[in-house]
Swiss-Prot record:
MF terms (GO), sorted A to Z: transmembrane transporter activity
Coiled coil regions in record: 115-165
Subcellular location: Cell membrane
Primary role: Part of the ABC transporter complex YtrBCDEF that plays a role in acetoin utilization during stationary phase and sporulation.
Lipid linkage positions (N-palmitoyl cysteine): 32
Pfam families to which the protein is assigned, alphabetical: FtsX, MacB_PCD
Protein's name according to its UniProt entry: ABC transporter permease YtrF
InterPro entries tied to this protein: ABC3_permease_C (IPR003838), MacB_PCD (IPR025857), Macrolide_Exporter_MacB (IPR050250)
Organism classification: Bacteria, Bacillati, Bacillota, Bacilli, Bacillales
Length: 436
């Protein structure tokens, strides 16, 4: 019997009992959809956490916090590792400063000294302009201009904060400097304070030209009003502010040449005694947790698939009983037991896979509706905006589809094995005599 004839025989027999086959496929569809949708919640939460982690930092950056035995960290040593594009050392100063542009001032910026050539190698992300090339050029944060306020705007804003009584989020912030700040020259005043009294003891003023603006932060709640100054000024500032105190913080970042090498670079640094953190280390623990979580959800979903397998088993058992004469005739004309077994297993697999395919299609629709409706519901209950909830509540990757097909198809075949084995053991004489 040719394979084409076997398929024709299976389809003809399934059409004889359309209602029973339909109900069996429906049960399989519901079980598969339940498995996929339930598991997609775990995949969705993991995707949300991963995307948030990836968006909040530079993915190729490996932060170096220290070394075993409190040994000094040498920039030259870090540059020798494989796959290193650049090593950036940033020194942040915690002293009062005021940036002035015309009648506007910004007193909420942090001063960061860095090597601009290293920043250029590390592909410093800019919204506008370029990386500073001369010592009197600076790069400012995306929100720097927004913090340039007139004296009147500052006083009104501070007054509203005092009147808000602990609810500053309800206050509308002033727009600040709305024109293009690129290529503008600002006056930067830096003050030295007494460590005991907190009073200002000295003040020094510098003129800087803004040649670059950093990229907009990935999250709406994040703000960047930093001022990046060439480290050529570091010595001058150090003598004035006395960097030996606790008013400075130095951060070292090692940038890999591409994301695929971040994990290897992180492992190499860790093996040599460096205390590091990167995207891969932050996601490692989360991935382990979500792996266990997803396995648990898939296991729960498998219970529904196993229940649907009972329906497939009953359907195939009834099919063998009803086709006793046909089985006897096929055996009488020379059909081997393996062909008969294959035909019933193919029918069982057909029911399982068809139900699985329909279930997956339905799952994608349910997943889309969940991601559309849940943010609206949460926004309505919390009084916020649905657009602010940039979360994925349900996500169906290709791996989940493959898992669902394997589970449903495998369970369907296993459910049909016993009826198929029973069909091969049918006695020819008994089958033909029964019909007479």
């Amino acid at each position: 019997m040719r394979f084409k004839d076997q398929v024709h025989f299976i389809r003809r027999n399934m059409k004889k009992n359309r209602l029973r086959v339909f109900m069996t496929i429906l049960a399989t569809t519901m079980a598969c959809a339940f498995l996929v949708v339930l598991s997609s919640v775990g995949f969705g939460i993991q995707k949300t956490i991963t995307d948030m982690t990836m968006s909040q930092q530079i993915v190729t950056k490996v932060s170096v916090m220290g070394k075993e035995g409190d040994k000094p960290i040498k920039k030259a040593d870090l540059e020798k590792y494989d796959h290193v594009r650049s090593v950036v050392e940033r020194t942040q100063v915690y002293e009062p400063n005021k940036a002035t542009l015309g009648n506007r001032t910004n007193e909420s910026s942090n001063l960061i000294f860095t090597n601009m050539n290293d920043e250029l190698k590390a592909n410093m992300e800019l919204e506008k302009g370029r990386v500073a090339k001369s010592e009197n050029e600076i790069v400012v944060g995306y929100d720097f201009a927004k913090r340039l306020l007139t004296k009147k705007e500052s006083e009104e804003y501070n007054k509203k904060i005092e009147e808000a009584k602990g609810n500053p989020e309800d206050i509308k912030e002033p727009k600040g400097y709305t024109k293009d700040i690129l290529n503008k020259t600002i006056e930067l005043s830096v003050s030295k304070t007494d460590s005991k009294t907190g009073d200002v003891t000295k003040t020094k003023t510098y003129d800087f030209k803004i040649v670059g603006i950093t990229k907009k932060p990935s999250q709406d709640w994040m703000e960047d009003s930093n001022i990046f100054i060439s480290d050529q000024f570091k010595k001058d500032f150090s003598e004035f502010l006395d960097f030996k105190g606790g008013n400075v913080e130095t951060n070292i970042g090692v940038f890999a040449d591409k994301f695929e090498n971040v994990e290897q670079l992180t492992n190499d640094l860790t093996d040599d005694g460096y205390y590091v953190t990167s995207v891969t280390t932050e996601l490692e623990g989360a991935n382990t947790f979500f792996m266990v979580f997803k396995i648990g959800l898939i296991f729960v979903g498998c219970i529904a698939v196993i229940i649907s397998a009972i329906g497939i088993f009953n359907t195939m058992t009834m099919a063998v009983t009803e086709r006793t004469q046909e089985i006897g005739i096929m055996k009488a004309i020379g059909a081997s037991p393996s062909i008969i077994r294959r035909m019933f297993l193919m029918e069982s697999a057909y029911i399982g896979i068809l139900g699985c395919v329909i279930g997956i299609i339905i799952s994608y629709g349910v997943s889309y509706l969940v991601n559309l409706a849940v943010p609206m519901i949460l926004a309505a209950t919390s009084g916020g905006d649905a657009g602010d909830l940039n979360y994925t509540f349900s996500y169906i990757p290709a791996s989940l589809v493959i898992i669902a097909v394997v589970i449903c198809g495998g369970v369907a075949v296993i459910s049909g094995m016993n009826p198929a084995r029973k069909a091969t053991k049918t006695n020819v004489l008994t089958a033909l005599r029964r019909e007479l």
